Design a protein with these regions (language model features):
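S-adenosylmethionine
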Residues: 2-340
Length: 340
């Protein structure tokens, strides 16, 4: 589909791209292993090198979206599961390759790059031939193998069986619609930086580059089709941030005339602030001293990067909000935002 393909430099082409596909496949496989191990995808992404992050993120999310199908196909191709690293790589590629329609790369490119990914890792080097054999068998027997997996609800709905069973029990008339909606791709929604431009001006900038968009909420813009975020007009100039429409409600609700009521700049705490979307929104809407707090130092770096791009400034602190004695200066806050 277009949003997925847009994350890559050269979809459906076989010439070299700026970041080798095999490296992106390795990164996506590592993220899949992290999620299988109980880690948040958001946290795992923080460890991915910046130049790799857009492609790796797109591959990993795609793999998770089709993981039920990919795991069912892997079971048909190999009755005994391979080591975890090889299994993750195989599932990522099967998620990419099982549908021919709108695939981001041609089948032989994916197979070739999957083998390269396996060869370039000590954990999967000895599984390269196995991965190559599984994928080439799938290409030969695609229709039959997909039909075999259609009997498994996890493959059809790409949800765990316990989740499917629970939905069928709790929502007997709507469970299929719920699963379909849950499998749909979320739209790309931006928040316009009111310090830099107006929403109408930004909609015009999108229109001039051939992108269809519409207003949503008070400061939001929803794109008709997703694009790589750094390629959107005004990215480097800090004209917008990516933020869901629901998340854009937090800052206005918190402020709600508070500055006018007090008649002075506000002192605000954003606890658990990373990656900084709501911190930035607060600073865009009012003159305030905002303390952006997060327990993860790496994620605090992301807050700083985002604020720098937007031309905003906050007091960023690496600390545990639950232990104020370690970071609080004793000055009362006019408002506290906690999204946890």
């Amino acid at each position: 589909d277009r949003p997925f393909r847009a994350a890559f430099m050269s979809p459906m082409q076989d010439h070299p791209i700026s970041v080798p596909l095999w490296r992106q496949l390795q990164g996506a496989s590592s993220l899949l292993m992290a999620v299988r191990g109980g880690q948040s995808m958001t946290v795992a992404l923080e460890k991915v090198e910046g130049v790799l992050r857009p492609g790796v993120q797109a591959l990993a999310f795609h793999a998770l979206r089709w993981l039920g199908r990919a795991e069912a196909l892997r079971q048909q191709l190999a009755k005994r599961p391979p080591p975890p690293e090889a299994d993750a790589l195989l599932c990522v590629v099967l998620a990419l390759i099982w549908q021919e329609k709108d695939a981001p790369y041609t089948p032989h490119t994916l197979v070739d790059q999957a083998v390269e990914a396996a060869k370039h890792s000590d954990a999967t080097r000895h599984q390269a031939s196995f991965i190559n054999g599984c994928l080439r068998r799938f290409l030969r027997e695609r229709d039959a193998l997909v039909a075999l997996t259609d009997r498994y609800p996890q493959a059809v709905w790409n949800h765990p069986q316990w989740w499917i069973d629970r939905l069928r029990k709790d929502h007997p008339d709507e469970w299929e619609d719920i699963l379909r909606a849950n499998n749909s791709r979320a739209p790309l929604i931006l928040r316009v930086n009111a310090r830099k431009t107006t929403r109408q001006q930004y909609l015009q900038a999108l229109h001039e580059t051939g992108l269809e968009a519409a207003p949503v909420g008070e400061h939001g813009v929803i794109l008709a089709s997703a694009r790589p975020v750094p390629s959107l007009p005004g990215f480097d100039q800090g004209h917008f941030s990516v933020q869901d429409a629901a998340a854009q409600l937090a800052a206005p609700l918190l402020l709600d005339g508070l500055g006018a009521q007090l008649g002075r700049p506000l002192n605000i705490l954003d606890a658990c602030a990373a990656p900084g979307g709501k911190t930035a929104h607060l600073l865009e809407l009012t003159d305030a001293c905002v303390t952006a707090l997060d327990i993860d130092a790496r994620r605090c770096e992301r807050i700083q990067q985002n604020l720098d791009r937007l031309g905003l400034d906050a007091q960023i602190r690496v600390a545990d909000a639950a232990q104020p004695d370690t970071w609080w200066d004793g000055r009362s806050y006019d408002a506290i935002l906690l999204d946890a």
